[in-house]
Amino acid sequence: MTENTKTGLALALEDWRILINDDWRSLAVALYMVLIGYGVLVGIPVISTAWVTKLGFTEVEVGRVAGMDLGGLSAGAIVTAWIINRVNRRILVFIGIIIAVVANGMCLKYVDYDTVLWLRFLAGFGSGMYTAVAVAIFGMSIRPALAYNLMLFSFAFSQALEMRILPQLSMNGIYWVFIGCFLATIPFLKWIKSYPKTRPVEERSSTNDSNARYALFLPWVCLFAIFLTYINIGAYWTYIELAALDSNTNPNLVSEVLVWASLCSLLGCLIATLLSNRFGLLRPLLIALFTMAMGVGMLAFGINE
């Protein structure tokens, strides 16, 4: 009875306590895994520049290599989603690590475009398997929305860190960072539950039943929205640093802007969390879409200083 009467900060702290006490080890390793698994995605501006400046790829080739890497990430995640309830999760993670490490290791030796193209697909596929298990762990937690918020907040810091560190490394150095981060997961595989634990299913009210047909379509609408969002991200995020450097912008300024833009996403996550707690999910989403559309529109129509 006391828990139901809590509001505001007290309720938020109680939710955090429940989430952490549920299975903090599994949550911790899943958080690490999702940050490493999405490492190429969030660091793609820096990595794309490295492919051009250090390996001599053209901008068209960079787009294809990045597309293969992220396409592999998607393919690995889809395959894992099909089998995750029937296969030991530790085995799935271990297989993903092996594939990603071997593919990244071969990239140390092979630098020609055709070979790198397929090696990046394999690396992405392994990352997709690895990351899909981590995302599933968040989804099966006792407070999934809070767990995903934690993931988004953490992305801001990991992305800023990548933007700061990766430009200082050689191409092989970047590959070694990913190899080391994947291998560092192995000692903690025992923290991952082999199979999802069952939770009691809550009874649905008659109000929910009346909206059942909408509930069936809602996940697919959300997936389609995510699909379109990531197409937009891929369209500019791969080339954002290359485009800035091509226009003779100071490289140090470009690096600083990317770092601070990453940290600003932390503020966006905080505002979205506060708004969603008070007004639900729709209004923060509409505000975010309007803000992004306005920003891209300003850039498209000549704001370049």
Report residues per predicted region:
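Cytoplasmic helix-loop-helix junction between adjacent transmembrane helices
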Residues: 119-153
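Helix-loop-helix hairpin linking two adjacent transmembrane segments in secondary transporters
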Residues: 150-194
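Helix-to-loop junctions at the C-terminal end of transmembrane segments
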Residues: 76-89, 268-281
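Extracytoplasmic gate region of multi-pass secondary transporters
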Residues: 44-45, 217-259
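Helix-breaking motifs and short loop linkers at transmembrane-helix boundaries and internal kinks
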Residues: 56, 88, 109-111, 280, ...
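Paired small-residue
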Residues: 114-122, 305
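Transmembrane alpha-helical segments of major facilitator superfamily
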Residues: 64-73, 255-265
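Structural signature of the two symmetry-related core transmembrane helices
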Residues: 91-105, 283-298
